[in-house]
Amino acid sequence: MGMAMRCVLVLFSVSPVLLLFNFEMLEVALHLASREKELDTAAVTPSASLSFLSRFRIMLGMNHHRSRGRRHKRCSEAPAPAPAPALVPAHQARSEAPAPLVHVPRKGMPSTHRSHIAPARSPVHKVKDGGHTKIPRSAIVALGVVGLCLVVLGVVIAAFSVRRSRKFKKVCTKAFKPFHHGSRDQRSPAATRKVSSHPSPDPLTLSSIVQYQQNLPNLKQSSESKSLSIQSTIPMGTELIVSDHAVINNSQSDEVESFHSIPCSDLSAGSITELPQQICDRRAIMNRSEYFLQTHDSPSDSSYQSLSPDCTSRLSPKDQTFTASSHLSLRSKTCPEKSDGENAEINCHDGLEITCISGSMEHKEAPIEERARINFRNPPSQHIFPPSYRTDTSQSKINIAFTMTNSEVESSSKESSRIETSSSMGIPKPAPPPPPQKNPPPNLKGQCYGQPPPPPPLPLQIQVGKDGSPLPRLKPLHWDKVRAAPNRSMVWNDIRSSSFEFEFDEQMIKSLFAYNLQGSMKDEEAMNKTASTTKHVIEHHRLQNTTILLKTLNANTSQVCNSVIQGNGLSVQQLEALVKMKPTKEEEEKLLNYDGDINMLDPAENFVKVLLTIPMAFPRMEVMLYKENFDDEVAHIKMSFAMIEGACTELKSSKLFLRLLEAVLKTGNRMNVGTLRGGASAFKLDALLKLADIRGTDGKTTLLHFVVKEMARSKGLKALEKLNETPSSCHDTPTEREEYSSMGTEFVSELSNELGNVKKVASIDLDTLRNSISNLSCGLAQLRNLVEKDLASDDKNNNFLQCMKSFLNHAENTMQGLKADEAQVLLNVRELTEYYHGEVSKDESNLLQIFIIVKDFLGLLDKVCREMRGTKHNQTLNLVLPLK
């Protein structure tokens, strides 16, 4: 007996106790009510306690002792005559009822002279306020408690039923797991069994799925083994095909098995084992049968199919196998349930045959074309019903497809089907299933999900040239395509493919922009093959850089070696790449001392090792690079010196700049009147940059604007005097002053053109210029040492020495003149700085700072001149427009 059944029995036993407890509470309540109100004692029985039957009748309201007349209910009750006192024994004194009380009528109610004895009332009814009777509140509470107990008991029974059904479903799910994990190859022919039942008006459905238990002796069944032989005959107009479906697991949702139908007519009689528990849900069967009768459309899902007898004859026992540890019991809608646990039998009356799988069964899966075929014995009247019964759990699904004919099936309510089972002692255990397949075949996937397999990918379109050969892939040109606008005229509409007269040189475009896929693949394969056999001497990062530089040479090893020996024949870019390949002293020693196979080294290391065989190879390359860059470096330095000298000359000889300084000096002294800064005779040029920071009261005009206007007016006045040859008056009108300033603004703006070299010199870094001269001197010293000391005068080095000695003489003379020019330029810059700033300390880092100041001031001056010209132009327009 299970734990749940024990709990139910305990509840059943506790319920009477609760009822008795409620009866006791009811008795106490009635006793208290009788004492409080002191009702009529005549209605009370001589005994103070009520019997059990009376209490139960009172609780259910069955004890009604009401008077036959309703007139006593509303009328006032007259007191009953008191009996004559009598002597009673002492032991009966307590049991006697007290004397009746005199009834006091209500106020405002007419008194009646009628007096009679009130009828005796039940102790359940209370006399309250005019004779109205009500059930006591304690009785209502007791009845509510009893009802609540009954409701709780019903809920517990319902929960137990639901729990038992869920547990049964879980057991069925576990029982079908071997169908999922097993394969179809493990089925045995002896596992097929046939069950015949009398057909009913409704289609036959799968009514129950029960668990097979191995410990059959523990069940309430007979230990006697019986064999059941079921013979069936199939009517001519009826054929039932049951298809088995593979169970789908959640973890392997895509592993779907196809269905196979096995006709019942080709199977022989077998034995069926009794299942320990059988449940027949008649309501579910009726609903499913109604769904089958209402649904006549062919199933759209291709996961279940029926095979004809022709197809089943082609099955072989070497195909997929299902292994199960549970048995399926198929019943009709009218199968009765047996509560006494006896064995049941299914009597076959009309020969309807069903094939069940118990244990393992082997059959061969037919091809797709054959599985799609269905044999109909009565084509005009048959219907194919979709699967309606589906045990929907997280681990298993079972679909059953039925093929029915038009022949009516006679039903009989008197007939009953029973399954008589016996436990055979020699039941062989099925073999362990093989591991499940991870991916089903592609044809099964398409069948299970009801959709055709995906089409194969389209082949890439290969472009073909004029000769019919495929065009190679070139490096792409990344651009954004423009969509054609049908409602708009575009320039691209006039361009046609045939309008391009120029024909591509296919060979040239292949050689320039084709992907060298084969070459790169060969190089990668060669690198992979030699990766394990090569020995690296140079550090990995430096080796990568050397490999990259080696590709930029565009020359083989012999050409490079000959050029290094001769001292010429290499460009500046090649010499720069070779100089960067120079190894460290340790790497040079390792390469020179390497005695192994030279092919074992990396190609870059091999190249460097060959170069090291030339005496002083890398010093040669360095002096060769120095020779190639010497003339360019000297020309750049001399040009810089020339610009510096020109800037010094311009600043010293510019009269306009001198007039500007004069105007600034006078204006500054006027601004600094009354301060320590007033009365200055000179100022540093960096004060010119501060003129734009001092603004007037209007917020627009700066001190630089004022200085420029005064200079322009002065220049314009002088120019006008030269043209008219008349002296200027001291009192000029504002209009005349504007004319003078407009004429003089052009002269002031010319200062930027006069000091053109000053702007160029401002971009020169004197420290960089000095470093360039120092590098040339160091390279010349290295060349002198190489020619005079390092290289011996032999036949191999003769050409190199002659070439370098001639260059050495030229370089020495050039460097001497370059150093003299450097000294002269620096002297001129110092003199210019002293000319404007006075004495300059020798520790001043940048002597060219004066040129930077003048350049910035010229930029401010040009901006002010443009603003002044624009303002005058706007004023002219404002004067002309009103006249129109």
Swiss-Prot record:
Write out the GO MF terms. actin filament binding
Q: Is Membrane included in the keywords of this UniProt record?
A: yes
Which residues lie within the region annotated Disordered?
179-204, 295-318, 403-473
Q: Which residues form the signal peptide?
A: 1-19
Provide the alphabetized UniProt keywords. Answer: Membrane, Signal, Transmembrane, Transmembrane helix
Q: Name one GO biological process term.
A: actin nucleation
Residue stretches of biased makeup (Low complexity): 300-310
From start to end residue, where is composition biased (Pro residues)? Answer: 429-443
* PROSITE patterns reported in the protein's UniProt record: FH2
Q: Which residues form the FH2 domain?
A: 464-884
Q: Per the record, GO CC terms?
A: membrane
Q: Where in the cell is it found?
A: Membrane
- What InterPro entries does the entry give? FH2_Formin (IPR015425), FH2_Formin_sf (IPR042201), Formin-like_plant (IPR027643)
Which residues span the membrane?
A: 140-160
Does the entry feature the keyword Mitochondrion, yes or no? no
Its record classes its membrane topology as: Single-pass membrane protein
Q: Which family does it belong to?
A: Belongs to the formin-like family. Class-I subfamily.
Q: What PANTHER family does this protein's entry cite?
A: FORMIN-LIKE PROTEIN 11 (PTHR23213:SF177), FORMIN-RELATED (PTHR23213)
The name under which this protein is listed is Formin-like protein 9
Species per Swiss-Prot/TrEMBL record: Oryza sativa subsp. indica
Q: What is the gene name?
A: FH9
